[in-house]
């Protein structure tokens, strides 16, 4: 199963055709998942006019909880990478730990936020997108 990061969902909501096409294609291989962190990020960042579309999108994913095991793994990752990658937030560590503990493939546009996955590549290209550091 693929764990989809918030930035992929945001690209879809902003009408990026490559994001929509990738989501449609990825669903052919089975259900997709998101972290509870992505749920909070999307709800927290949505505009009032987007409410219905955001809720519909979120309902189409399996939501992975942040368990104690995931929290401990996120803490381990944070200790390892906090000096070399000091702009990675707790949310991204929790998403990374969810993927690691649940043995899920991670799909993100911000690969720099996930140095713990050395072979990670963005699932699609977004013209003009520059990952945030």
Curated annotation (Swiss-Prot):
EC number(s) reported in the record: 3.1.-.-
Name of the coding gene: vapC10
Keyword set, alphabetical order: Hydrolase, Magnesium, Metal-binding, Nuclease, Toxin-antitoxin system
Residue stretches making up the PINc domain: 2-119
Family as reported in the entry's similarity comment: Belongs to the PINc/VapC protein family.
InterPro entries: PIN-like_dom_sf (IPR029060), PIN_dom (IPR002716), Type_II_TA_system_RNase (IPR050556), VapC_family (IPR022907)
Positions of Mg(2+) binding: 5, 92
Superkingdom of origin: Bacteria
GO cellular component: plasma membrane
Any one Gene Ontology molecular-function term assigned to this protein's record: magnesium ion binding
Protein name (Swiss-Prot/TrEMBL): Ribonuclease VapC10
Required cofactor names: Mg(2+)
Function: Toxic component of a type II toxin-antitoxin (TA) system. An RNase. The cognate antitoxin is VapB10.
The organism of origin for this protein: Mycobacterium tuberculosis (strain ATCC 25618 / H37Rv)
């Amino acid at each position: 199963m693929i764990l989809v990061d918030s930035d992929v969902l945001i690209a879809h909501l902003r009408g990026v055709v490559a994001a929509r096409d990738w989501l449609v294609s990825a669903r052919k291989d089975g259900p997709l998942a998101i972290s509870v962190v992505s749920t909070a990020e999307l709800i927290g960042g949505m505009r009032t006019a987007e409410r219905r579309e955001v809720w519909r999108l979120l309902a189409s994913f399996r939501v992975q909880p942040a368990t104690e095991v995931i929290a401990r793994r996120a803490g381990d990752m944070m200790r390892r990478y906090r000096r070399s990658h000091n702009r990675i937030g707790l949310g991204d560590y929790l998403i990374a730990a969810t993927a690691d503990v649940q043995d899920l493939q991670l799909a993100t546009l911000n690969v720099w936020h996930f140095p713990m996955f050395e072979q990670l590549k963005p699932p699609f290209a977004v013209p003009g997108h520059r990952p945030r550091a």
